């Protein structure tokens, strides 16, 4: 546990306003605001590192002086059940702190709803909007297409080219014509001397 001292407070500030300022840094065990005299407060953090974060961010804000308290009993009664200033700011009854109030049972304690909303490393990359989408989740123009879909189209040869047309020789060429010698050449006529030739 770590206790934080807050000074230079406006006398009209309430414990609820103080809690709202400090609960963003971690779980608060209690918040106590002085009234007699007013002007300061003590906040108990469950984790010392949360208290250091709050001091770094809130010291000087609104003119406040915020520092780590070195005195465990500063500003508070030693008897948890006594003291006129020891009143629960939730119900107004003395004898218990707000974190023990019956009206807050089930809420998980002060600041439990916003546990460690800031990173202890206080790295800039955790501040601001951190929901920017990584480039690897962006849909590229070729999303869902396989590499073969992007390859150049090939001509389809489902129909094979027809074979070269062969000349048909179903009708064989006619053999060369031979001269017909069916008619034998005429025999030279035998000249027979007519018996009457000499008598002529």
From Swiss-Prot:
<dbReference type="InterPro" id="IPR012677">
    <property type="entry name" value="Nucleotide-bd_a/b_plait_sf"/>
</dbReference>
<dbReference type="InterPro" id="IPR050907">
    <property type="entry name" value="SRSF"/>
</dbReference>
<dbReference type="GO" id="GO:0008270">
    <property type="term" value="F:zinc ion binding"/>
</dbReference>
<feature type="compositionally biased region" description="Basic residues">
    <location>
        <begin position="113"/>
        <end position="139"/>
    </location>
</feature>
<dbReference type="GO" id="GO:0003723">
    <property type="term" value="F:RNA binding"/>
</dbReference>
<dbReference type="InterPro" id="IPR000504">
    <property type="entry name" value="RRM_dom"/>
</dbReference>
<dbReference type="GO" id="GO:0045292">
    <property type="term" value="P:mRNA cis splicing, via spliceosome"/>
</dbReference>
<keyword id="KW-0508">mRNA splicing</keyword>
<dbReference type="InterPro" id="IPR036875">
    <property type="entry name" value="Znf_CCHC_sf"/>
</dbReference>
<dbReference type="InterPro" id="IPR035979">
    <property type="entry name" value="RBD_domain_sf"/>
</dbReference>
<dbReference type="GO" id="GO:0016607">
    <property type="term" value="C:nuclear speck"/>
</dbReference>
<dbReference type="Pfam" id="PF00098">
    <property type="entry name" value="zf-CCHC"/>
</dbReference>
<protein>
    <recommendedName>
        <fullName>Serine/arginine-rich splicing factor RSZ23</fullName>
    </recommendedName>
</protein>
<keyword id="KW-0863">Zinc-finger</keyword>
<comment type="similarity">
    <text>Belongs to the splicing factor SR family.</text>
</comment>
<keyword id="KW-0507">mRNA processing</keyword>
<feature type="domain" description="RRM">
    <location>
        <begin position="2"/>
        <end position="71"/>
    </location>
</feature>
<comment type="function">
    <text>Involved in pre-mRNA splicing. In protoplast assay, enhances splicing efficiency of WAXY intron 1 and alters the selection of the 5'-splice sites by stimulating site 1 (proximal site).</text>
</comment>
<feature type="region of interest" description="Disordered">
    <location>
        <begin position="105"/>
        <end position="200"/>
    </location>
</feature>
<dbReference type="GO" id="GO:0000398">
    <property type="term" value="P:mRNA splicing, via spliceosome"/>
</dbReference>
<dbReference type="Pfam" id="PF00076">
    <property type="entry name" value="RRM_1"/>
</dbReference>
<dbReference type="InterPro" id="IPR001878">
    <property type="entry name" value="Znf_CCHC"/>
</dbReference>
<feature type="zinc finger region" description="CCHC-type">
    <location>
        <begin position="86"/>
        <end position="103"/>
    </location>
</feature>
<keyword id="KW-0539">Nucleus</keyword>
<keyword id="KW-0862">Zinc</keyword>
<keyword id="KW-0479">Metal-binding</keyword>
């Amino acid at each position: 546990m770590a206790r934080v001292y807050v000074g230079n407070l406006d006398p009209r500030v309430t414990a609820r306003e103080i809690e709202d300022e400090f609960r963003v840094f971690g779980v608060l065990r209690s918040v106590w605001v002085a009234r007699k005299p007013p002007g300061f407060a003590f906040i108990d953090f469950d984790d010392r590192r949360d208290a250091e974060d709050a001091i770094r961010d809130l010291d000087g804000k609104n003119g406040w002086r915020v520092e780590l308290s070195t005195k465990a009993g500063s500003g508070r009664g030693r008897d948890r059940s006594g003291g006129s200033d020891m009143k629960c700011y939730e119900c107004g009854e003395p004898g218990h702190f707000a974190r023990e109030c019956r009206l807050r049972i089930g809420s998980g304690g002060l600041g439990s709803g916003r546990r460690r909303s800031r990173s202890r490393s206080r790295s800039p990359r955790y501040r601001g909007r951190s929901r920017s989408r990584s480039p690897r989740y962006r849909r590229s123009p070729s999303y869902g297409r396989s590499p073969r879909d992007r390859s150049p189209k090939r001509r389809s040869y489902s129909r094979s080219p027809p074979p070269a047309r062969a000349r048909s020789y179903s009708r064989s060429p006619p053999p060369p014509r031979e001269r017909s010698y069916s008619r034998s050449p005429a025999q030279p006529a035998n000249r027979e001397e007519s018996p009457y030739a000499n008598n002529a």
